[in-house]
Structures are given as structure tokens and as C-alpha cells.
Regions:
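C-terminal "cap" of GNAT-fold acetyltransferases
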Residues: 13, 26, 87-92, 126-129, ...
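Conserved phosphate-binding and hydrolysis motifs of nucleotide-dependent enzymes
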Residues: 66, 70, 107-109, 147
């Protein structure tokens, strides 16, 4: 899993926080049309809260020619990336993977996931986890192509919303 040559992956700078927020909200806006209103309200609120949070996470971006194309957060294993809903897993958690609509199909998501895998391995993690839902079909298919497997013991269901499905990539 190596990034496409035209996409640079790096840590987000502090002055890019608002740009990352705007990019992420634009990327996730498509789900408003495919989720139930309750599921969308829950996801939108959770994404906005996570973006505003100062929780310890590595904030990673992908860019080309100085233009942000995508972002992801990588939470350490000691941090509960979803509050009390999912509980803590013993591995890092990839969250808020977002690719600008105009950059889809360029390998940006794959490059960001590859960077999370690289960092998790460097930290000595035995696995890398993530959560997704049936509404996120394109992302789910990409995760499965990259070797992530279902970890249903880490599923959770917010009240009135669709099931949030746990996935894990074994790194050992």
C-alpha cells in the first residue's frame, strides 16, 4: 500500500484545522441523502464533535500541489475514539477518513489508510481498527480490499441510528 506519486501524505498543520473541517464535512455530506434522518443527524453531530475535539489523535492530510484532497484521524489505543458507544479497543483506531468529492478515485483514501497502517506498525500495534456503516459502501469495499476484516464484537448501535460496524486489520 503506497500512496500515488502525485499525492503527498503528511501531518496536518495547526493552521489547517478549519480547512480539514470543511473538507471533512463536504466529504460526509453525501450520506445525508442515503441515511435515515436519525442516522444522518447522529453521524453529522458525531463528525462535528470529533472535528472540534482536542482528543489526542494524529491528524493526517493528503495533498497535491498544495491543495488538500483528504484527511484522516488516527487515535491511539488508549483513547476511546467514539466516547462510551464503542468502548476501547487494544489497537489504534482510524477515524474520519474523508476525501474531497473532486478527488475521489485518485487513490487518496488508499494513501491515507496506508499511512495509518505504517504508523500503527511503527508503534508496534498488533492491529488497526475502524468503524463504518452499510451506508458507506464505497469506503467499506475499499477497507475490505485493503485486508480489513469484520470485528463484530466491536459493533455498536447509537440510539435510532444504523449499526456501526467494527473492522480490524491484523498487523502481525
Amino acid at each position: 500500500m503506497t500512496p500515488p506519486p502525485t499525492v503527498a501524505v503528511r501531518d496536518a498543520r495547526a493552521d489547517e484545522r478549519d480547512a480539514v473541517r470543511v473538507l471533512t464535512l463536504r466529504a460526509y455530506a453525501e450520506y445525508a441523502t442515503v441515511m435515515t434522518p436519525a442516522s444522518w443527524a447522529g453521524l453529522d453531530g458525531a463528525v462535528r464533535a470529533a472535528l472540534a475535539s482536542d482528543a489526542p489523535a494524529e491528524r493526517i492530510v493528503a495533498e497535491r500541489d498544495g491543495v488538500l484532497l483528504g484527511s484522516v484521524h488516527l487515535f491511539p489505543p488508549v483513547v476511546d475514539a467514539y466516547g462510551a458507544l464503542a468502548g476501547r479497543a487494544p489497537w489504534p483506531e482510524l477515524r474520519l477518513l474523508a476525501v474531497a468529492p473532486e478527488a475521489r478515485g485518485l487513490g487518496v483514501g488508499r494513501a491515507l489508510v496506508a499511512e495509518c497502517v505504517r504508523r500503527a506498525r511503527r508503534a508496534g500495534a498488533s492491529a488497526l481498527g475502524l468503524h463504518t456503516s452499510a451506508s458507506m459502501r464505497v469506503a467499506m469495499a475499499m477497507y475490505e480490499r485493503l485486508g480489513f476484516e469484520r470485528a463484530p464484537e466491536h459493533d455498536f448501535q447509537p440510539p435510532g441510528a444504523e449499526l456501526v460496524q467494527g473492522y480490524r486489520l491484523r498487523l502481525e
